[in-house]
């Protein structure tokens, strides 16, 4: 089972192109700092503005750099089922351990359409699938009934849940059991998520605080919620600051402060505002990540 702190990796850019050297450096640093797993080419990785070739290259580079030291869950979702299958097939080819597959966005499929989409991916490629339920971005929500049907498919092993509805964790656990891998998609609510039966988080904050995020997850999984709460209190200002402006603008600014990459995004995303920068800077200092 996938569990612990999985980092939703940013994609570094330099002069408009993917900065492969910075990406490799980031992956190596994450592993050194104790991150439990890597998730390239998701929302935080600016996948909507990566070309297909860039997307595939980033996934391949992540797998090659990790060298099996930690699992790689490759972003492979699309609102075009054929495209999702293509990206999933490539992820398997280069050795990813699983894929993160988002619900159809913009075209707003019905529950039957959501099921048919993921079944097509499941049937086409033999690789573990983590469903990505983020209705705030996709407009559609995978209902409990549909989630239960999807878990009956051979390759569907769990969900990245970014609904911020903590009761859903318990409901899904009741329907599908503890073997259904539930990963939080919200840093701020990850404490409660794991208390309800979750086993980890695909984290934005882990880009700049990997050791703390890993220690936090280890504490919750060990049942040491006193220690987890101490870390949560330390990180909470940063969790909030990283979403003052649209993600990943604030976290790229934070990564730049640590010398990890340039503070560069692709349009239509723009760098964090001056006000957001001040909040991020203060939160980084509060967490002990900067002097």
From Swiss-Prot:
The record marks 43, 106 as: Part of a proton relay during catalysis. CDD domains: DHDPS (cd00950). Catalyzes the condensation of (S)-aspartate-beta-semialdehyde [(S)-ASA] and pyruvate to 4-hydroxy-tetrahydrodipicolinate (HTPA). PANTHER family: 4-HYDROXY-2-OXOGLUTARATE ALDOLASE, MITOCHONDRIAL (PTHR12128:SF66), DIHYDRODIPICOLINATE SYNTHASE (PTHR12128). This is 4-hydroxy-tetrahydrodipicolinate synthase. Belongs to the DapA family. One of its GO terms (cellular component) is cytosol. One of its GO terms (biological process) is lysine biosynthetic process via diaminopimelate. PROSITE patterns: DHDPS_1, DHDPS_2. The lineage of its organism: Bacteria, Pseudomonadati, Pseudomonadota, Alphaproteobacteria, Hyphomicrobiales. HAMAP family: DapA (MF_00418). It comes from Parvibaculum lavamentivorans (strain DS-1 / DSM 13023 / NCIMB 13966). It catalyses: L-aspartate 4-semialdehyde + pyruvate = (2S,4S)-4-hydroxy-2,3,4,5-tetrahydrodipicolinate + H2O + H(+).
């Amino acid at each position: 089972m996938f569990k612990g702190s999985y980092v939703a990796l940013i994609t570094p850019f330099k002069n408009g192109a993917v900065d492969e050297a910075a990406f490799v450096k980031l992956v190596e640093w994450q592993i050194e700092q104790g991150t439990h797993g890597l998730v390239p080419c998701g929302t935080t990785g600016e996948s909507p503005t990566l070309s297909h070739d860039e997307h595939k290259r980033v996934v391949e580079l992540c797998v090659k750099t990790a060298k099996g030291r930690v699992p790689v869950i490759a972003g492979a979702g699309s609102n075009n089922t054929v495209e999702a299958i293509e990206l999933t097939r490539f992820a398997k080819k280069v050795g990813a351990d699983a894929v993160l597959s988002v619900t159809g966005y913009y075209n707003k499929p019905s529950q039957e359409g959501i099921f048919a989409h993921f079944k097509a991916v499941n049937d086409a490629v033999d690789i573990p699938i983590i469903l990505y339920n983020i209705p705030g971005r996709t407009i559609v929500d995978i209902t409990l009934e549909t989630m239960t049907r999807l878990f009956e498919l051979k390759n569907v092993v769990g969900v990245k849940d970014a609904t911020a509805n903590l009761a859903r964790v318990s409901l899904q656990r009741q329907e599908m059991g503890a073997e259904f891998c539930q990963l939080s998609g919200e840093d701020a609510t990850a404490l409660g998520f794991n208390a309800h039966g979750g086993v980890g988080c695909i984290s934005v904050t882990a880009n700049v605080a990997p050791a703390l995020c890993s220690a936090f997850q280890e504490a919750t999984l060990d049942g040491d919620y006193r220690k987890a709460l101490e870390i949560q209190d330390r990180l909470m200002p940063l969790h909030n600051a990283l979403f003052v402006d649209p993600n990943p603008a604030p976290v790229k600014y934070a990564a730049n402060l640590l010398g990890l990459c340039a503070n560069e995004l692709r349009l239509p995303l723009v760098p964090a505002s001056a006000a957001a920068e001040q909040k991020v800077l203060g939160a980084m200092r509060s967490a002990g990540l900067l002097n």
